[in-house]
From Swiss-Prot:
Binding annotation for GTP 1: 10-17, 57-61, 119-122
Pfam families, sorted: KH_dom-like, MMR_HSR1
GO biological process, one term: ribosome biogenesis
PROSITE patterns recorded: G_ENGA
One example GO MF annotation: ribosome binding
Domain KH-like, residue spans: 352-436
Protein name per Swiss-Prot or TrEMBL: GTPase Der
PANTHER family the record matches: GTPASE DER
InterPro entries listed in its UniProt record: G_ENGA (IPR031166), GTP-bd (IPR006073), GTPase_Der (IPR016484), KH_dom-like (IPR032859), KH_dom-like_a/b (IPR015946), P-loop_NTPase (IPR027417), Small_GTP-bd (IPR005225)
Family the UniProt entry places it in: Belongs to the TRAFAC class TrmE-Era-EngA-EngB-Septin-like GTPase superfamily. EngA (Der) GTPase family.
Binding-site residues for GTP 2, renumbered to this chain: 181-188, 229-233, 294-297
Primary gene name: der
Every EngA-type G domain range: 4-167, 175-351
Length: 436
């Protein structure tokens, strides 16, 4: 289910990033150290009173070539386009500025709820001065000291109160996927080619995200697909459209709404940092991943071309060793007929459930091959394992001491599970828990 979105806006140096980190809490830390992946800090997930939501820091979207006020306005426009709830941040230390008023003037046009935060309210005297901010016309100001964590609970309460009502769970039989990649990798051509392959295409309907267009289609076996697309990629004339961080943010939102991500790479250009960043986000989000190398027809090839390209992919995407690769051409149609079946196979792997008895046989065989590690004379004991979730498949391994389960041994167990069962295209999670 797609999460609602909260966007943070405000001029520089009012403390947007600190507020972002406060709201995100521990969730913004990188749980898994993935070499070569830069985790983008403008997009995170927060949770309060059991409600989860995405947070966007529009201040992370840099428009360095643009005039100062143009950048401020662009941030506000992004918030109005993307968010369910908008947080406007001002500085209680410096008071109201022209830039604050410019943001307020833009936010007057939105029908989205706006929460006004007066940051850097670190003492009672400054708290008395927050009433000046009523003149912005954005409602009751919330006094906050993001550095000290003062007042953030009230802000989180306000966020949750203003989030849209939760919608019912969507049909799990429908496969939702998105095509993600840098500009000019051929996403549009691939979309058109996929939809042109004698599919029964329903009329595009508005998705749960504002201004998003999701395309529903059915294949020859009556499997229903939803192709997630973001209309923002189709808009023109917006000053922030070509900034990389805005593109990253759009991609992250599409990933959030997808079951499976088709990571599209331009064969002519190879893998760039953007690709690694987005792939890392999809991996951490537990999404199914299919690597699609487009424009394969444009390369001059010899017997080793595909082998060399796969080596580059596996070297740079070490954390995606489970993701299948397909080399296609949207222009000629080469191998495009494979995509729907590959997507369905990944969807099947994501939803695969393994009985505890069969799983534990695999675990015990693995331990026989490679005995559990020891630390200071104490050996790790594995009592049993069980599957607790799907999408992605998640297993809990009950042990005598969690600290004895080294990451490398957990990875070994994962590899043995993958050898025993078909989990191609999906991450699987193994969690060590002390048996009580």
């Amino acid at each position: 289910m797609s999460l609602p979105t909260v966007a943070i806006v405000g001029r520089p140096n009012v403390g947007k990033s600190t507020i972002f980190n406060r709201i995100a809490g521990e969730r913004i830390s990188i749980v898994e150290d993935i070499p070569g992946v830069t985790r983008d800090r403008i997009y995170a997930t927060g949770e309060w009173l059991t409600r989860k939501f995405n947070i966007i820091d529009t201040g992370g979207i840099e428009l360095s070539d643009e005039p100062f006020m143009t950048e401020i306005r662009a941030q506000a426009e992004i918030a109005m386009t993307e968010a369910d709830v908008i947080i406007a941040v001002v500085d209680g230390e410096t008071g109201i500025t022209d830039a604050d008023e410019a943001v307020a003037n833009i936010l007057y046009r939105t029908d989205k709820p706006v929460i006004l935060i007066v940051n850097k309210v670190d003492n009672p005297e400054r708290r008395m001065e927050i009433f000046d901010f009523y003149s912005l016309g954005l409602g009751d100001p919330y006094p906050v000291s993001a550095v000290h964590g003062i007042g953030t609970g009230d802000v989180l309460d306000a966020i949750v109160q203003n989030l849209p009502n939760e919608i019912e769970e969507e049909n799990e039989d429908v496969i939702k996927f998105s095509l993600i990649g840098r500009p000019n990798v051929g996403k549009s051509s691939l979309i058109n080619a996929i939809l042109g392959e004698d599919r029964v295409i329903a009329s595009p309907i508005a998705g749960t995200t504002r201004d998003a267009i999701d395309t529903h289609f059915v294949d020859s076996e009556d499997q229903e697909f939803v192709m997630i697309d973001t209309a923002g990629m189709r808009k023109s004339g917006k000053i922030y459209e070509n900034t990389e961080k805005y593109s990253v943010m759009r991609a992250m939102r599409a990933i959030d709404r997808s079951d499976i991500v088709l990571m599209v790479i331009n064969a002519e250009e190879g893998i760039r940092e953007y690709d690694m960043r987005i792939a890392g986000f999809a991996h951490e989000a537990g999404k199914g991943i299919l690597i699609v190398v487009n424009k394969w027809d444009t390369l001059e090839k010899d017997n080793d071309t595909m082998k060399k390209f796969e080596l580059e992919i596996r070297t740079k995407f070490k954390f995606l060793d489970y993701a299948p690769i397909v080399y296609v051409s949207a222009k000629t149609g080469q191998r495009l007929n494979k995509l729907p079946d590959m997507i369905k196979e990944i969807h099947h792997a994501q939803n695969l459930r393994i009985s505890s008895s069969v799983l534990n046989d695999v675990i015990m065989d693995a331990v026989a091959i490679n005995p559990t590690p020891t630390d200071k004379g104490k050996r790790l004991k594995i009592f049993y394992a069980t599957q607790v979730a799907i999408k992605p498949p998640t297993f809990v391994v009950f042990v005598n001491e969690e600290e004895l389960m080294h990451f490398s041994y957990l990875r070994f167990l994962e590899n043995q599970i993958r050898k025993a069962f078909v989990f191609e295209g999906t991450p699987i999670h193994l969690i060590a828990r002390k048996r009580k």
